[in-house]
Amino acid sequence: MQDRFIRSITQLPTPLADALIPLLHQNFAGHIDAQQLAELVQSSQMTEAEVLLALLPIAAALAKPPISEFYVGAIAKGKSGDIYMGANLELPGEALFHSVHAEQSAISHAWLSGESQIVDMIVNASPCGHCRQFMNELVEGGQIKIHLPSQDSHLLSYYLPYAFGPKDLNVQSPLLVKHETEFALDSSDPMVIEALDHAGLSYAPYTQSYAAVVLETADGATYCGRYAENAAFNPSMLPMQMALSNLTRHNRDFGEIRRAVLVESSQGKISLVGATMDALHPVAAIELEHIVVDPV
């Protein structure tokens, strides 16, 4: 079991903890598939809702909040039945707008894993307005059920009435609908090709600034992040922040980053290169490789 879970596992009921420990191996990064979840429910003799709430301390252990020291965990349950953990991330010494919220982390985890819809969001603190707006961008976002400890469950529409969302800007295919944009690039570099593929899957209906970041560690492992825009603009999630959140969930340190690539469209209304460098340079003493590509 990873050291970061030693403290949080003691907060779980013993039967659930005993069933969960084998899953918390060195490669565990917060994903539990539907079959594994069913086995946890059976072994613990708890309801699924009780298990999901009980797992929040495990999700919170994925957090990296050096500024607030406030650990927030979130669990997104997909239509597939799989669950995806996420946690808040703050960049040390940097402006707060670089922060990743736990709900954003969990949703990006699900998105990168190929999930097509989120049906439940379990979180250990009430979602802030930023996260409510971010969730509203998703497929059937208003129908996502929000679960909080010691509170009744409610739909997102309860927390965000009279919501402004994609349809108000004539976007009919919201976040998590699979979007594929083709780009032209002649490269044999696997890391660049990976970034190109993820840029094609990014979500940028408001600026067409399709983009992705891939980070590589010294052992050759890669961690990606895609751009995810929002109808309210400010809650958009930048690809570098998503990639850093992804890396952190996998229990890797910023100091292990040896290479960073940003691929973005030449036809976007904005460029993400400045914001990407702003997030990278405080955590890794490397240069960003910036590649601009043309849509096919």
From Swiss-Prot:
Positions bound to substrate: N88, L89, E90
Entry binding sites for Zn(2+): H101, C128, C131
Cofactor(s) essential for the protein: Zn(2+)
One Gene Ontology term from the biological process aspect of the record: cytidine deamination
Transmembrane segments: none
Enzyme class: hydrolase
GO MF annotations in UniProt: cytidine deaminase activity; identical protein binding; zinc ion binding
A GO CC term assigned to this protein in UniProt: cytosol
CMP/dCMP-type deaminase domain location: 47-167, 186-296
SUPFAM superfamilies attached to this UniProt entry: Cytidine deaminase-like
Enzyme Commission numbers on file: 3.5.4.5
Pfam family, one: dCMP_cyt_deam_2
InterPro entries referenced in this protein's UniProt entry, alphabetically: APOBEC/CMP_deaminase_Zn-bd, CMP_dCMP_dom, Cyd/dCyd_deaminase_Zn-bd, Cyt/Deoxycyt_deaminase, Cytidine_deaminase-like, Cytidine_deaminase_bacteria
Cofactor note: Binds 1 zinc ion.
NCBIfam families: PRK09027.1
Family: Belongs to the cytidine and deoxycytidylate deaminase family.
Record function comment: This enzyme scavenges exogenous and endogenous cytidine and 2'-deoxycytidine for UMP synthesis.
PANTHER family: CYTIDINE DEAMINASE
Name used for this protein in its record: Cytidine deaminase
